[in-house]
A protein has these predicted regions:
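Conserved alpha-helical substructure of the radical SAM core
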Residues: 2-118, 124-125, 136, 205, ...
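Flexible mid-to-C-terminal extensions adjoining Fe-S/redox cofactors in radical SAM and related proteins
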Residues: 10-14, 18-19, 262-264, 280-360
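Short, intrinsically disordered, charge-biased short linear motifs at domain edges
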Residues: 25-26, 250-255, 274, 305-316
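Radical SAM enzyme [4Fe-4S]-AdoMet core and its adjacent flexible, acidic
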Residues: 4, 8, 99-102, 122-282, ...
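Conserved residues at the C-terminal ends of beta-strands
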Residues: 45, 79, 129, 200, ...
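Structured loop/turn residues at beta-strand edges in well-structured enzyme cores
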Residues: 22, 71, 121, 192, ...
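Short, flexible helix/strand-to-coil boundary loops that buttress conserved ligand/catalytic motifs
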Residues: 43, 116, 142, 285, ...
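Short, solvent-exposed beta-strand edge segments and adjacent coil->beta transition regions
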Residues: 24-26, 169, 322, 326
Length: 360
């Protein structure tokens, strides 16, 4: 009998607590850097064309997924750009089921209404971006007039998700433009019948501005939530309290980071295995000043061997005290899984989530 996601999670957790050979829990693959939005807090939809060239074909993508499965990775996130612009996305989701991986897709939801049944049959978790309840503000933040279309997509997905055994989540990016609305978005996510909401403070790196095209809408200076830091400190305790009544999946430990402003945490990049759109693994993580990329498709290395190489282990050690990043996908796992005794409540919450949605 195949192991469930919960058993995989617990097995990896206990192994990593006692062994120096640390295994990743999660994988992520950048499906594409193409995007049909032009968000003011994200550079990808605003990039110059040269950064969008080259993507794995279906066969290559499945080879990456096979390596993830062979390494006992529990779940894979399909990221972008906008993953639904890949016509083979459902096929990739079905391959995940075949090899025993949970699949999660982060999408802007623009194509969801017309594809809800197909997506929810193929994938385990759909995470749909919704940052505001104001259509005009949505247009200003996301650069496209698609608010009604996205909400319709969420509703259609919720209708079929139960029968298709797929969890529907909302993801809200917190930036200076929507801080006042966050509690209302949380409440609306529950009204829509979704399985939960994730809250993600917008991340900005200085070098991202060097990648944007002429006419870019990327505006980190005005969209930075730190412009309204005093209001963030009022918002965070409110969200922590709302977790008692609303399905906020974001951990207390992540939220408290933005209450205290203390980003001097121990980074654990071994928790996540990140692969870009051409099949290269990023070492030690996706966005450090020393990150290098290595192909997993050219036959020169296998993930399972390369992960424990001296080169990779050394790179991870160099960023263990990194304080230049507050990306959700790094901060939260590093706190919950890297400091479990301090964040036991969050760890138990994660285990509960796997028990609820871990169908593999």
């Amino acid at each position: 009998m195949p192991r469930t996601a919960t058993r995989k999670f617990m097995g990896t957790f206990f192994h990593n607590r006692v062994s120096s050979r640390k295994y990743p829990f999660f994988g992520s693959v950048e499906c594409t850097r193409r995007c049909n939005s032009r968000c003011t807090f994200c550079p990808i939809g605003n990039e110059r064309p040269e950064f969008k060239k080259g993507e794995m074909d279906t066969e290559q993508f499945c080879r990456i997924l096979d390596q993830f499965a062979g390494f006992d990775i529990i779940a894979v996130s399909f990221l972008g750009g906008e993953p639904t612009l890949r016509k083979d996305l459902p096929e990739l989701g079905r391959h995940c089921k075949k090899v025993g991986l949970l699949s999660q897709v982060s999408t802007n939801g623009i194509t969801l209404a017309d594809n809800a049944d197909e997506y929810t049959k193929a994938l385990d978790v759909l995470v749909v971006s919704l940052d505001t309840l104001d259509p005009e503000k949505y247009k200003n933040i996301r650069g496209v007039d698609k608010y009604d279309q996205v909400v319709s997509g969420v509703k259609e997905a919720v209708k079929v998700a139960g029968a298709n055994k797929c969890a529907i989540l909302v993801n809200t990016v917190i930036c200076s433009a929507n801080i006042d609305e966050i509690p209302s978005v949380v409440k609306y996510a529950k009204e829509l019948g979704t399985d939960g909401i994730m809250l993600d403070f917008a991340t900005f790196h200085d070098y991202w501005t060097t990648m944007t095209a002429q006419g870019s809408r990327y505006d980190p200076k005005s969209m930075d939530w730190r412009n309204r830091a005093a209001e963030v400190k009022k918002l965070v305790p409110m969200l922590i309290e709302m977790r008692k009544k609303y399905p906020i999946l974001t951990s207390k430990s992540y939220l408290k980071t933005f209450l205290t402003g203390d980003f001097h945490y121990r980074c654990h990049p071994y928790l996540f295995c990140c692969v870009n759109k051409t099949g290269e693994i990023s070492v030690p993580c996706y966005d450090s000043s020393i990150t290098k990329f290595y192909s997993l498709l050219d036959g020169s290395r296998r993930l399972k061997d390369f992960w424990f190489s001296p080169e990779v282990i050394s790179a991870r050690r160099q960023v263990k005290d990194c304080t230049t990043c507050y990306m959700h996908c790094i901060v939260e796992p590093s706190k919950v899984l890297g400091e479990p005794l301090r964040n036991m409540g969050d760890l138990l919450g994660w285990i509960g989530t796997f028990q609820k949605h871990g169908r593999v």
